[in-house]
A protein has these predicted regions:
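Single conserved hydrophobic/aromatic residue that forms the stacking wall/gate
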Residues: 1-11
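Terminal peptide-recognition signature
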Residues: 12, 34, 64, 86, ...
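Active-site neighborhood of HAD-like aspartate-dependent phosphohydrolases
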Residues: 14-70
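Short, well-ordered beta-strand core segments
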Residues: 28, 71, 94, 138-140, ...
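Short beta->alpha linker loops
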Residues: 56, 77-78, 99-100, 143, ...
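Substrate-recognition element of Asp-dependent hydrolases with the DxDx(T/V) motif
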Residues: 61-85, 132
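Helix-adjacent hinge/juxtasegments
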Residues: 76, 80-114
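Mg2+-dependent phosphoryl-transfer enzymes with acidic/Ser/Thr/Gly-rich catalytic loops
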Residues: 102-175
């Protein structure tokens, strides 16, 4: 969206529910389990694992991509559902089985020359804490661990992960 002609250097903020994010965001960096999923693993009869995705969140991914925003997924797990989602929506930045997420976040910031005003980080557990503390715009979900919900500057979605939280962020960003 265009910046104000009266105040060309003013960052405009969009609000949706509890969330407030600037119009300068170019990339959404997110965890997968607990944000795009309900944080549960389902064990099938053949001992394979499955995860549940909500169509509201999938539509959120679609809307962000359609509106030109980049999405990066940094997950502590390796999961074929991430690869399927990435392929369908042409998400290039997929980082799986990552133990120290902050290194990946910093490399994304450098690769895309992002300022603190140009990305938002979404996470739900202690392995996201370092990234959340580093980011200026940080979001978690209601079922996140307490340590995250009390982090300075954190915003909390109304919906849980895997139940519309990602869509809530997308709606806030695209208006």
């Amino acid at each position: 969206p265009p910046r104000s002609t009266l105040f060309p250097y003013t960052t405009l903020f969009r609000s949706m529910g509890k969330l407030q994010l600037p119009n300068t965001i170019k990339m959404v960096v997110t965890d997968f389990d607990g944000i795009l999923t309900d944080n549960c693993v389902y064990i099938n009869e053949d001992f394979t694992m499955s995860r549940k995705l909500n169509f509201k969140d999938i539509m959120g991914v679609h809307l962000l991509r359609k509106n030109g925003l980049q999405i990066a997924i940094i997950s502590g797990e390796k999961n074929s559902a991430i690869e399927t989602l990435a392929k369908k929506f042409k998400i290039e930045e997929i980082h799986q089985d990552i133990r120290i997420k902050i290194d990946v976040l910093k490399s994304l910031i450098e690769k895309y020359s992002l300022s603190q005003e140009e990305y938002v980080y979404i996470g739900d557990d202690v392995n996201d804490l370092e990234c959340l503390n580093f980011a200026k715009y940080k979001i978690t979900v209601p079922h996140a661990v307490e340590k995250l919900k009390s982090a300075e500057g954190i915003q909390i979605t109304e919906n849980n992960g895997g139940d519309g939280a990602f869509r809530e962020v997308a709606d806030c960003l695209i208006g």
